[in-house]
Regions:
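Hydrophobic alpha-helical transmembrane segments
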Residues: 59, 63-97, 104, 201-293, ...
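Cytosolic catalytic regions of P-type ion-transporting ATPases
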Residues: 7, 66, 97-210, 491-499, ...
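Cytosolic catalytic regions of ATP/NTP-dependent phosphoryl-transfer enzymes
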Residues: 290-431, 437, 450-451, 459-471, ...
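Transmembrane helix-loop-helix hairpins at the membrane interface
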Residues: 23-101, 108, 154, 344
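Membrane-embedded transport module
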Residues: 227, 481-528, 533, 543, ...
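Bilayer-spanning, highly hydrophobic alpha-helical transmembrane segments
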Residues: 46-57, 208-231, 256, 590, ...
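Actuator/coupling domain of P-type ATPases
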Residues: 2-28, 75-76, 84-87, 91-94, ...
Length: 778
């Protein structure tokens, strides 16, 4: 076996790579190019479109198969946009990979997790995620948390010979380990993927839209087949029956709606990437827009993650020199690499050459660290930690409380003549001094918190620090209700009411953070947890949405939906706005698509009963669908629209599309009756039908585009001009008769009445719904 201070040689690594003994990593956020092609091409609706187009071509009606071109354009746009987005997101994801340290040829080298090979010797420190199954060779107080694997949040000490599993993360101490399993034989493939996905999330938008698709999938073929049969039986012409069925079925298909929703989410991810916010879960964009409680970790979120040593308060009987020597001795003995240790080493240094008999590294659950050091006259133990945890049975020192009220982070330095054992505090502890450190509030935090509060988002601060200190800093950052603080180390039992009544929660253990999030969710809130430390991971996993900082721990980044690549918390505003833009715009776009779906379904059902040809043929509706749905939907999906979304997503869609669809049905039945009474030709009737459908669609488009800015005004003008040109210049190609005839007496009154009729039907539906809800409550 190789010595662990040397690790593997270059030749040994080469042989293992050749043998495939490499730590294969799970696929990231973005799908492969092949999967993008398959997802966009192999859809049920594309298959239906292709089948109908082939039948029409065989029947000698290739011009009526033009709708297939629209489907191809939609599919191509979706593929191109997703491939471009994949390239951008993959490039940014590389920056977020958590490197590991390995010994190779006697040197410490930095590797990506995918470069680890069997038998590699890795160096593990607090805050890192374990990337491969391994056995401990040497341990200096290593403690790991296996919550991602088992759901249990207790920290587990690991000693020589113990196994550490990929997907767990180190919370205290350090160790040297040898990799025992990689690739398919390791937990790494499955559990690193588990760490990277916060929850099995699905976008609410996608769930709703896929539900609509499922319903359409069940009805579109039976309705189309029945319509074909009744049309054929009524007219006896198989080509005419096929045209009617094709027109109905292509109209019922919401061409590109699900694709456009996915593309919109992906475009938002790219937009956020340009603002240095890495999206690790596309549904998270939408989820954050619906968040009504934002839970903040103090360190690295409210504060910028830097600590400054401020002062030493000596206890009676101890000198400044003794305290300085004790802190320097502790810093030399411990390998803690957190913010507190960094600030103390900068002030007191780290004594080298001391013989550390036993060390207890800091952990967020224990809230203290310590070391037993051999000195003349026997061993001495030094403890450094939160006063309330170092002296749990005593009243808080008055000086400590005073410092906490001033916003300082306070540590208690204590000594004992008893050797430390198994991470338990000695009984003869004596307080030597209080050490005061200060956090720096982020310069952009007050404005960011003010923005969220103005948007109706409640802010909660959840921290492991003293509640008085946290309360002071929260107030300084402008968080309302910061004075309502609670010490969670004294709290047991149900948190349902406690979590609603308070703003600041101090002395919170990692498991309590999770319980607070659960309580908020149990009260009906949509939650977001921000953090940068290992102790935030469990809560971030529990929350509906998690946000981590790039300079935080690897475990926190892996468990989050978003990583702020510059640790600029104001980027949260852009994430919220992107989510709102997606929800609001897709609601508008869905109304356009479902208008077509609803009226095509209603007309299909009507003409299964009526013994007349279907109101239009596919060729006539292809340009109208492109001008009123296909083209404007792409522009609408990407416009700025940052107002707070409504909770009633489906109701919001139907509020627009159902009245418009019923207006289409009314207009076409009136025109059908006029055609029968005045013996109009089918070409005349279908031309008027298509014109009136276009007017209804433009009425809806204008309504959902409000407020109409210059950009939308130009778009609507161009689309309107193209619609007019269709009837003036393109009628022959698209089988449209002239509108300049006596038929104007039929279609013009309906066109003029359309906006008013939509409003009347919409008002009736709304009042009926309100009456229904009122009677339901009674």
């Amino acid at each position: 076996m190789e010595r662990h201070d040397i690790g593997l040689t270059a030749e040994q690594v080469r042989r293992r790579v050749a043998a495939g003994a490499v730590n294969i990593q799970p696929q990231g956020l973005t799908p492969t190019a092949g999967r993008i092609y398959r997802k966009n091409i192999l859809t049920l609706f594309n298959i239906i479109n292709l089948t109908l187009a082939l039948l029409l071509i065989v029947a000698g009606q290739p011009q009526n198969a033009l709708f297939l071109g629209v489907a191809i354009v939609n599919t191509t746009l979706g593929i191109v946009q997703e491939l471009r987005s994949k390239k951008t997101l993959d490039r940014l994801s590389i920056l977020n990979q958590s490197a590991v340290t390995a010994m190779r040829d006697g040197k410490a080298v930095s590797l990506n997790p995918g470069e680890i090979v069997q038998d590699d010797v890795l160096l593990i420190s607090a805050g890192g995620q374990i990337a491969a199954d391994a056995v401990v060779l040497e341990s200096e107080g290593l403690e790991v948390n296996e919550a991602l694997l088992t759901g249990e949040s207790d920290n587990i000490p690991k000693r020589r010979g113990d196994t550490v599993l990929s997907g767990s993360f180190s919370v205290a101490g350090s160790a040297t380990v040898r990799v025992t399993a990689v690739g398919s034989s390791s937990f790494a493939t499955a559990l690193t993927a588990e760490a990277k996905k916060v929850k099995e999330q699905t976008s609410h938008l996608m769930r709703v839209l896929k539900g609509i698709i499922r319903v359409l999938t069940m009805v579109i073929v039976p309705i189309g087949a029945l319509l074909f049969y009744t049309q054929y039986r009524a007219g006896g012409d198989i080509t005419e029956a096929l045209l009617g069925a094709a027109a109905a079925m292509t109209g019922m298909i919401p061409q590109g709606l699900v694709m456009l929703t996915g593309v919109t989410l992906t475009v938002s991810a790219v937009s956020l990437a340009k603002r240095k916010a890495l999206v690790q879960s596309l549904p998270g964009i939408e989820t954050l827009a619906r968040v009504d409680v934002l839970c903040l970790d103090k360190t690295g979120t409210i504060t910028d993650g830097t600590l400054t040593f401020e002062q030493t308060v000596l206890m009676e009987g101890y000198s400044k020199e003794e305290v300085s020597a004790a802190v320097a001795g502790l810093m030399g003995a411990l390998r803690d690499d957190n913010l507190t240790a960094t600030a103390l080493r900068a002030e007191f240094g780290a004594a080298r050459g001391l013989s550390a008999l036993y060390t207890v590294p800091f952990s967020s659950a224990r809230k203290w660290s310590g070391a037993s050091i051999a000195v003349q006259g026997g061993p001495v133990s030094y403890i450094l930690g939160a006063p309330a945890f170092v002296f749990p049975s005593a009243e808080p020192l008055p000086q400590a409380r005073l410092l906490s009220e001033q916003g300082y982070r306070v540590l208690c330095l204590a000594r004992s003549s008893v050797l430390l054992r198994d991470g338990t505090l000695p009984d003869d502890l004596s307080c030597m001094a209080l050490l005061a450190l200060s956090d720096t509030v982020r310069h952009d935090a007050p404005d960011t918190f003010r923005f969220f509060a103005g948007q109706g988002v409640t802010l909660k601060v959840i921290s492991g620090d003293d509640p008085l200190t946290v309360s002071h800093i929260a107030a300084k950052a402008g968080i309302a209700g910061a004075e309502r603080a609670v010490d969670m180390s004294r709290v047991t039992g149900d948190l349902t009411f406690l979590v609603e009544e308070n703003t600041v929660f101090g002395r919170v253990s990692p498991s309590q953070k999770r319980e607070l999030i659960r309580a908020l969710k149990g009260n009906g809130h949509v939650t977001c947890m921000t953090g940068d430390g290992v102790n935030d991971v469990i809560a971030m996993k529990e929350a509906d949405c998690g946000v981590a900082m790039i300079n935080g721990s690897a475990a926190a980044r892996s468990a989050s939906d978003f990583v702020l690549m510059t640790s600029d918390f104001s980027a949260m505003i852009h994430i919220l706005n992107e989510g709102r833009r997606v929800i609001n715009n897709i609601e508008c776009v869905a109304a356009l698509y479902l208008l077509q779906t609803i009226y095509a379904t209603l007309l299909s059902l009507a003409y299964i009963i009526l013994p007349y040809p279907f109101p239009y043929v596919p060729l006539q509706m292809t340009p109208v669908g492109f001008l009123t749905v296909g083209l404007p939907s792409f522009f609408l999906a990407l416009r700025r629209n940052y107002h707070k979304p409504r909770d009633r997503f489906v109701a919001g869609i139907l509020e627009h599309s159902l009245p418009a669809a019923l207006t289409v049905l009314f207009n076409i039945l009136i025109l059908q009756a006029a055609g029968i009474m005045f013996e109009l030709g089918q070409g005349e009737i279908s031309t008027m039908n298509v014109f009136c459908i276009g007017i209804v669609a433009f009425t809806l488009l204008l309504r959902i585009s409000r407020p109409v800015n210059i950009y939308m005004g130009v778009l609507l003008s161009v689309l309107g001009a193209a619609f007019a040109a269709l009837f003036l210049l393109g009628g022959g190609f698209f089988a449209l008769d002239s509108l300049f005839s006596r038929n104007a007496f039929f279609y013009l009154p309906l066109a003029v009445m359309t906006p008013h009729l939509c409003g009347l039907i919409g008002g009736f539906i709304r009042r009926t719904g309100e009456w229904w809800q009122l009677n339901k409550k009674r």
